Amino acid sequence: MFLGGAVLLILCVLPAGMSRSAWLAAGGACLCVYAWHMDWADKFRLLWQQQRLRVVMAMIGGLCILLLVSHLLFVLKPDSARGRLFMWKITCRAITEKPLTGHGIHNFAAVYGNAQEAYFAAGDYESWEERVAGSPEYAFNEYLQAAVEWGVPLTLCGLAAIVICLYIGIKKRRYGICGAILSLMIFSFSSYPLQLPVFIVTFIALLLACVCGNSRWEWIGLAILAVAVGGFRLKNDLRIEQACREWMNVRVLYNAGAYESGEREYVSLYPLLKERAAFLFEYGHGLHKLRRAEASNRIMREALKLSCDPMILNIMGKNYQQKGDYLAAEECFIRSTHRLPGRIYPYYLLAKLYAEPAFRQPDKFETMKRIVLTKEPKVQSTAIRQMREEVNKMIVKR
């Protein structure tokens, strides 16, 4: 009864979520658990010996069905699928830069941003790639992200350890636990579950449940270890949680434009939240609004190590422009256009920069003006209309 209710709830929730990754993970894991329980491997070996031709035909038919399902999942949300494929393409380019050692933990976003910037700067790309490109925090593929951060050898070692745990679990006939691990592994191919602490803890617990015996002392030892690790992290985690609560309150001042009042709060929260790109961006942007260009750029450079958002480069460029360092401002704005060429805003900033009396460049201004007026945005908005109206009124004499 309980099992039937759980299955019914899953069937209700999965379609509503419109998550193709979740559908594949649930379907694939359930199929494997059923196959293990029904001893499909032994039956397959027997059929292969007796009716090899039928098995081959069935495999070809299954492959055709799989291709059809893949096509249907693609056309369900085509731009989303293309976006994932493009993300993985850029991630693979980042992996080739440091395949053995990786770029370091928590460095994915910055590395991805640099790789995407270099790719678009080369100019050899398709129009659909410009349309679907974004500034992701994660690779939407845990295996590729691990290869970027840890390097390929360490990633393969981690995968080997997981496979060994699964093998032991199957030998011990712990099919439900192995199915849960498998579903998480399938889901990890096109999402980012292991970037969330709850999934990491769950994954480790499932792996331990695969390999541990039935001894009470083993489980007591694991429980003591879990409590010790949790207790060790508890104090710092509580401090960060409290800092995040205070940050949410300070955001009210930031969104209201009270940058002077908010700046004092950002200074006090900085030691605890300096590893969060969103916090650093707000802090640096507030300093920019207060016309404290040097301090703003110092914070923005830190944010650039944690994020691939081109708005960071835009703010840095505006800070340089405030200081009169027009060449540095131009470099930042051009980098922003390469990082996400589909955005109109950095072209608008370049047009305004080339119209500056101290940095007047009529030819470049006309090029940027034409791009701002003719480039098709992803979504039409009031901001784009206002930018176009402003640029259209600007005249730079030769």
Functional labels for PLM-detected ranges:
Residues 1-3, 42-55, 163-178, 292, ...:
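Membrane-interface helix-loop-helix junctions at transmembrane boundaries of multi-pass membrane enzymes
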Residues 2-10, 137, 169-191:
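Loop-to-helix entry and N-terminal half of a specific, functionally important transmembrane alpha helix
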Residues 4-38, 70-74, 151-152, 189-198:
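Helix-loop-helix junctions and helix-breaking kinks within/between transmembrane helices
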Residues 25-34, 61, 158-161, 174-221:
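Transmembrane alpha-helices of multi-pass inner-membrane enzymes
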Residues 69-86, 227-257:
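Hydrophobic alpha-helical transmembrane segments in integral membrane proteins
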Residues 105-148:
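Interfacial juxtamembrane loops and adjacent helix segments
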Residues 247-248, 278-282, 311-318, 344-349, ...:
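Alpha-solenoid helical repeat scaffolds
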Residues 262, 296, 329, 364-365:
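Single-residue signature of alpha-solenoid repeat helices
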